[in-house]
Design a protein with these regions (language model features):
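Conserved acetyl-CoA pyrophosphate-binding loop and the N-cap/start of the following alpha-helix
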Residues: 78-87
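Conserved GNAT acetyl-CoA-binding A-motif
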Residues: 93-106
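Conserved catalytic-core motifs of GNAT/GCN5-like acyltransferases
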Residues: 101-103, 113, 118-138
């Protein structure tokens, strides 16, 4: 492997990024949506083997005391080689004074525990499609409320 880390969006093939997310079993959108999300993020990390994108991640942050980490993905054929560790460490180094909330895929908790991430007792999320997130294991339960309950 010839691993290279990039921290800007200038060389990203957004269709390839979409494919990496899909192959890693993550949520994915049109390439233009990912481009906008990464370009507007505080921190981003892209991992290449030679010129092939194999892993990625990003954080949104105020850069002072709060951050949220999203889209940590490594191609399955590269998992277990420390690529995810490189991504997480680079992101955490970019937000050294910040508390960070992580949006992780179900079943990946043990990996993130190695970096001192812990489950929150008070964390909550609003999803555009709560039923889908329930089916994918992201939330424990959901109750459909109409707009009058807000």
């Amino acid at each position: 492997m010839n691993i290279r880390v990039e921290k800007d969006c200038s060389n990203v093939d957004w269709n390839r990024l979409r494919a990496v997310l899909k192959e890693a079993g993550m949520g994915y959108h049109d390439a233009d949506i990912h481009k906008k999300a990464f370009e507007n993020s505080y921190s981003k990390v892209f991992i290449y083997d030679d010129n092939e994108l194999i892993g990625l991640g990003r954080a949104i942050s105020d850069g002072v005391y709060q951050a949220a980490i999203y889209d940590i993905a490594v191609l399955p054929s590269y998992q277990g080689y420390g690529i995810g560790k490189i991504i997480i460490n680079n992101i955490l180094e970019s937000i050294p004074q910040c508390n960070a909330i992580l949006y992780a895929s179900p079943g990946k908790e043990d990996f993130y525990n190695k970096f001192n991430f812990r489950k929150m007792k008070t964390g909550m999320a609003y999803f555009q499609n709560a039923e889908k997130m329930y089916e994918r294991g992201f939330i424990e339960k959901f109750i459909v409320l109409n707009n009058e309950n807000r």
